């Protein structure tokens, strides 16, 4: 097992310092937008922002949940900003994004969990950036009747909802969520709009067993999920769950090979894999893999 007191070399990344990085940072600040890149202390922020890639957080910056893996602020959430969809669309247009990823904090305080706000953001982007493909990474909408229908009707190109970890760790790592609710949400979106690609991700290094990871793969395929991401859990602060193990690149490759045998259209399994990392390139590969699988010989 790798020494847990320091990150192994395969986790280390260069500090961001490019002009493109700072241009992206300034644009996001000027439009009063939030990004998961900053809020979650993502290790890939330098690379992504240098390429003008950013994952936008909507519905404010304060979450109603307190998951033990996440660095986003928790507490009493902000009031909904009715102008946020327009500002988001403006950022997408100014960054000239071919593919945008939109995520959010959990909003258990809202009647629909924020589903209609996601839909408004998608609609605004479609108006001004007609060729931009849209990926949304949503919360679980636990006990929010009708939320899945709102999301499915808004027709994102990719619907992503992360199961995050194995079910045995939910009580300690993701206490406000329910594993089977997450599976049900993913399955419902696919049933409501089969043309939407579905995606889910999980972290490893939290103390899970490999047989549990494989069972999650099977559960996600049963829910007709197309794309699986697996990445290393990194402790944001000392107040969060500790890293139980730094999984080696070879072990990630092994997990990736197993996942591919399960029938996913696409698998990304590396230490630095995150839900929206290389999302634009992965979307193109996802479409190509779908077309290849459905081409009649």
Swiss-Prot record:
Pathway: Protein modification; protein lipoylation via endogenous pathway; protein N(6)-(lipoyl)lysine from octanoyl-[acyl-carrier-protein]: step 2/2
Source organism of the structure: Rickettsia akari (strain Hartford)
Keywords: 4Fe-4S, Cytoplasm, Iron, Iron-sulfur, Metal-binding, S-adenosyl-L-methionine, Transferase
GO CC aspect terms: cytoplasm
Binding positions ([4Fe-4S] cluster 1): 37, 42, 48, 276
Positions of the Radical SAM core domain: 49-265
InterPro entries: Aldolase_TIM (IPR013785), Elp3/MiaA/NifB-like_rSAM (IPR006638), LIAS_N (IPR031691), Lipoyl_synth (IPR003698), rSAM (IPR007197)
Cofactor, how bound (note): Binds 2 [4Fe-4S] clusters per subunit. One cluster is coordinated with 3 cysteines and an exchangeable S-adenosyl-L-methionine.
Subcellular location, record wording: Cytoplasm
Name of protein: Lipoyl synthase
Enzyme Commission (EC) number: 2.8.1.8
Known catalytic reactions: [[Fe-S] cluster scaffold protein carrying a second [4Fe-4S](2+) cluster] + N(6)-octanoyl-L-lysyl-[protein] + 2 oxidized [2Fe-2S]-[ferredoxin] + 2 S-adenosyl-L-methionine + 4 H(+) = [[Fe-S] cluster scaffold protein] + N(6)-[(R)-dihydrolipoyl]-L-lysyl-[protein] + 4 Fe(3+) + 2 hydrogen sulfide + 2 5'-deoxyadenosine + 2 L-methionine + 2 reduced [2Fe-2S]-[ferredoxin]
Similarity annotation: Belongs to the radical SAM superfamily. Lipoyl synthase family.
Molecular function, one GO term: metal ion binding
């Amino acid at each position: 097992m790798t020494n847990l007191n320091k990150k192994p070399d395969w986790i280390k990344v260069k500090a961001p310092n490019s002009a493109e990085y700072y241009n992206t940072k300034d644009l996001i600040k000027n439009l009063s937008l939030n990004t998961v890149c900053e809020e979650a202390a993502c290790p890939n922020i330098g690379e992504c922002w240098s390429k003008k890639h950013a994952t936008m957080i909507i519905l404010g910056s304060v979450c109603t949940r307190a998951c033990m893996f996440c660095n986003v602020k928790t507490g009493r959430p902000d009031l909904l900003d009715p102008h946020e969809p327009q500002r988001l669309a403006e950022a997408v247009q100014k960054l000239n994004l071919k593919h945008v990823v939109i995520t959010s904090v959990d909003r258990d305080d809202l009647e629909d969990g924020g589903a209609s706000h996601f839909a408004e953001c998608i609609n605004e982007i479609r108006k001004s950036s007609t060729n931009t493909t849209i990926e949304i990474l949503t919360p679980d909408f636990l006990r929010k009747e009708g939320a899945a229908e709102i999301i499915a009707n808004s027709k994102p190109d990719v619907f992503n909802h992360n199961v995050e970890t194995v079910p045995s760790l939910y009580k300690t790592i993701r206490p406000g969520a329910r594993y089977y609710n997450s599976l049900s949400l993913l399955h419902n979106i696919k049933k409501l709009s089969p043309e939407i690609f579905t995606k889910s991700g999980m972290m490893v290094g939290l103390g899970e067993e490999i047989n549990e990871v494989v069972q999650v793969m099977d559960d996600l395929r049963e829910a007709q999920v197309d794309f699986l991401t697996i990445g290393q859990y990194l402790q944001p602060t000392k107040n969060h769950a500790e890293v139980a193990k730094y999984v080696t690149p070879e072990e990630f490759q092994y997990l990736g090979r197993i996942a591919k045998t399960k029938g996913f259209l696409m698998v990304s399994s590396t230490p630095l894999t995150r839900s929206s990392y290389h999302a634009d390139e992965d979307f193109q590969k996802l479409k190509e893999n779908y077309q290849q699988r459905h081409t009649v010989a």
